[in-house]
Amino acid sequence: MPTINQLIRKPRARLTVKSKSPAMQNSPQRRGVCTRVYTTTPKKPNSALRKVAKVRLTNGFEVISYIGGEGHNLQEHSVVLIRGGRVKDLPGVRYHIVRGSLDLQGVKDRKQARSKYGAKRAKKAA
């Protein structure tokens, strides 16, 4: 245990917290251009074809981000908005693409949790 004098000379080091989404640079969202849109498989024990896109951001970072929801209209050179948030079963995917913003359309025929997928409210059938 250090003496008070030792602590005055050299205070205790503060623990630095490492960012889980460094490419965001403390922004809530970032804009970028898709450089590659493809599917990848999750790690064990899950099995699927997850839709992901490699995105070059306006700040120069190139990140892999997840495209949530059923179906999408993304292709190379699409402009997208990304937010933080990893996908647990896809290593290296630390960002999500925001649905219904810029070039990415919302999920069609979505009834529940619509705001998460950029879906407008359905018209009431009279």
Curated annotation (Swiss-Prot):
Chain segments annotated as transmembrane: none
CDD domains: Ribosomal_S12
GO cellular component: small ribosomal subunit
Residues with 3-methylthioaspartic acid modification: D89
Xref: InterPro entries: NA-bd_OB-fold (IPR012340), Ribosomal_uS12 (IPR006032), Ribosomal_uS12_bac (IPR005679)
PROSITE patterns named in the record: RIBOSOMAL_S12
Keyword Transferase found: no
GO MF annotation list: rRNA binding; structural constituent of ribosome; tRNA binding
Protein name: Small ribosomal subunit protein uS12
Organism: Polynucleobacter necessarius subsp. necessarius (strain STIR1)
